[in-house]
């Protein structure tokens, strides 16, 4: 082996500068190896991928959503109706009519068609009188509430006193649908006699 001084002479001044530059670069570089950095960043990526749900794995829902679903599932039909109505009001959702069957899209109508339709609409009310009605309770006097609840229980099939009370507390409510005119007027008179305000639709 050659002594250190001799090896420096063999390398020459250029190689000595390169060596100094390499040493300086090593001092300025972070102490972490590039290969180690690659391994750790790929490890982080694999952790992120491992945490992501797979397509065939069941989705995990937050506890807040699970509790909300359980609460909605435990509601009665009257409460669901109220929830639906309140959500429509809160979110400003308008009722949408049914789509016509067969993919028919309403389009522009000629000027002659509205005139003939108007004539038909005038004839229909003259020829046909309504025979069936929906009895709807719109208001209840607080004083006569107990009598009204008992009377509603008589006219609504399959309802108990607790359900009748909830019905009276969440007005307006439909009492009976598709009822003959005579029976609808009888129900209206009975409910108004015990303090209810009834509308026939």
Swiss-Prot record:
Modified residue annotations for N6-succinyllysine: 153, 165, 181
Covalent cross-link Glycyl lysine isopeptide (Lys-Gly) (interchain with G-Cter in ubiquitin), where: 153
Family listed: Belongs to the bacterial ribosomal protein bL12 family.
Region annotation Disordered: where it falls in the sequence: 37-60, 109-130
Transit peptide: first to last position: 1-38
Gene Ontology molecular-function annotations: structural constituent of ribosome
InterPro entries reported for this sequence: Ribosomal_bL12 (IPR000206), Ribosomal_bL12_C (IPR013823), Ribosomal_bL12_C/ClpS-like (IPR014719), Ribosomal_bL12_oligo (IPR008932), Ribosomal_bL12_oligo_N_sf (IPR036235)
Organism: Mus musculus (Mouse)
UniProt main location, coarse: mitochondrion
Function text: As a component of the mitochondrial large ribosomal subunit, plays a role in mitochondrial translation. When present in mitochondria as a free protein not associated with the ribosome, associates with mitochondrial RNA polymerase POLRMT to activate transcription. Required for POLRMT stability.
GO CC field: mitochondrial inner membrane; mitochondrial large ribosomal subunit; mitochondrial matrix; mitochondrial ribosome; mitochondrion
Phylogenetic classification of the source organism: Eukaryota, Metazoa, Chordata, Craniata, Vertebrata
Gene name, Swiss-Prot/TrEMBL: Mrpl12
Keywords: Acetylation, Isopeptide bond, Mitochondrion, Ribonucleoprotein, Ribosomal protein, Transit peptide, Ubl conjugation
Top-rank taxon: Eukaryota
Modifications the protein undergoes after translation, according to the UniProt entry: Two mature forms are produced by differential two-step proteolytic cleavage. Cleaved by the mitochondrial processing protease to produce the long mature form and subsequently by the mitochondrial intermediate protease to produce the short mature form.
Protein name: Large ribosomal subunit protein bL12m
HAMAP family in alphabetical order: Ribosomal_bL12 (MF_00368)
Modified residues (N6-acetyllysine): 128, 141, 145, 147, 153, 166, 176, 181, 188
